[in-house]
Amino acid sequence: MSQKTMELYIHIPFCVKKCQYCDFLSFAADEATQAAYVEALLREIAYYGPHCSDYLVSTVYIGGGTPSWLTEEWMAQIMSAVRRSFRLASDAEISIECNPGTVTDHKFAVYRNAGINRISIGLQSAVDEELKILGRIHTFDQFLKTYELARKNGFDNVNVDIMSLSLIHISEPTRRVVIS
């Protein structure tokens, strides 16, 4: 009989600010709220891990929100709890969503040390005017720097999210309706 596998999704609902187009559960939160959430998340990971002991985790995806908005210490604690509580495949893909402006060289180094091996960067558009309309907190230049930092820290698997249709390419009346 083959090994049963599972995927693990961890939601971090915090963002610097909510983008206008985002339908995901996410919001800005102070440090105390984030700390309480991380503590609750660590308890849940410890609780559910033993219930999944028959499974090998092939993928861990840390999404949001903006998981990279959390401190690197909290992310290291989360990854440590995952490793203690779940059986990870030796070749498990472990991804984290990052937004330019919320990561540093040090954060990427901590992620790499914690076993994260895939970065997903939310670029959305390479046009600064469009990024502003979308409510993004970064510029295209900041994205390029973030991408280079990820590569410099040994991340060979870097995903870039780009929207296929954006508000700058539609008529002004339609844009107003979509934004409202």
Regions found by a protein language model. Give the residues of each.
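Active-site-proximal cofactor/substrate-binding loop regions of enzyme domains
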Residues: I119-S120, L131, R136, D156
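Hydrophobic faces of well-ordered beta-strands that scaffold small-molecule active sites
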Residues: L8, V60, I94-I96, I119, ...
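Conserved glycine-rich "GG(E/T)P / GGGxP" loop and the immediately following alpha-helix
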Residues: L25-A28, H51-S85, N99-A109, A126-Q142, ...
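Single conserved hydrophobic/aromatic residue that forms the stacking wall/gate
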Residues: I168-S180
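A short, N-terminal amphipathic alpha-helix
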Residues: L41-S53
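A structural motif corresponding to the C-terminal end of an alpha-helix
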Residues: S85, A114, L149-V158
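Canonical Radical SAM [4Fe-4S] cluster-binding loop centered on the CxxxCxxC motif
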Residues: Q3-A36, L131
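Non-cysteine beta-strand/loop elements that form the S-adenosyl-L-methionine
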Residues: H11, F108-A126
